[in-house]
Regions:
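Structural signature of the two symmetry-related core transmembrane helices
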Residues: 78-91
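Residue-level signature of mid-helix packing/kink "hotspots" within the transmembrane helices
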Residues: 56-60, 64, 149
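Interfacial helix-cap and linker-helix signal at transmembrane-aqueous boundaries
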Residues: 38, 69-70, 156-163
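A late C-terminal transmembrane helix in Major Facilitator Superfamily
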Residues: 133-160
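Helix-to-loop junctions at the C-terminal end of transmembrane segments
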Residues: 63-74
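Single conserved hydrophobic/aromatic residue that forms the stacking wall/gate
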Residues: 1-7, 12, 172-179
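Extracytoplasmic gate region of multi-pass secondary transporters
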Residues: 13-53
């Protein structure tokens, strides 16, 4: 869909948008409904809180590694790998109930978060140049904020309709692949 924005021509491709927006909607939904996830999985009250250490550690490590990888291979080449850890995290949430799976789940989300933070800036600069990077970042940040609201609302609607975490995670597993 071509879009004119502050004198620049910017093409938002569905696959790029869905790739970039999957991380914020799934991660935010997970963070907001962590007590529901913990209860659904039968985890103790501190399991997810402790698992955020894995999220933080893997996110920071991935931030450093992804910068090096982008310089070596380019953002476009790495973009296709950004949501693989997120996909794996959703599979872990769907299939596994042990407390240890919470650490794996949030660690994998941390990896996707680290990739998304770096790729979220460098991808647009690679594709469209830096002349209108402020306008492009403003638009993509607005879309990201919408994505976080969408994810939280979708989680809430599915939970309010009586679904357990497994069907909710399955929904979040399949939606980003529909583009």
């Amino acid at each position: 869909i071509p879009l004119r924005l502050v004198g620049s021509e910017m093409c938002i491709r569905d696959s790029i948008c869905m790739t970039m927006l999957a991380m914020p909607w799934i991660a935010t939904g997970t963070f907001v409904y962590q007590s529901f996830i913990s209860t659904s999985k039968g985890w103790g009250p501190y399991v997810i809180a402790q698992s955020f250490m894995a999220y933080s550690i893997f996110s920071v490590i991935t931030l450093f590694i992804s910068g090096f990888l982008i310089d070596k291979f380019s953002s476009r080449r790495l973009l296709i790998y950004m949501n693989i850890p997120l996909l794996m995290a959703t599979v872990v949430l769907f299939y596994f109930d042990s407390s240890f799976s919470s650490f794996i789940f949030l660690g994998l989300i941390g990896i996707s978060n680290g990739l998304a933070n770096v790729l979220g800036s460098s991808t647009w600069a690679e594709i469209y140049g830096v002349k209108y990077i402020g306008s492009i970042k403003a638009l993509t940040t607005a879309l990201m904020v919408f994505s976080t609201a969408f994810g939280t609302a979708l989680f809430g609607i599915l939970i309010d309709n009586g679904l357990s975490i497994e069907p909710v995670s399955y929904t979040h597993l399949t939606l980003p692949t529909k583009a």
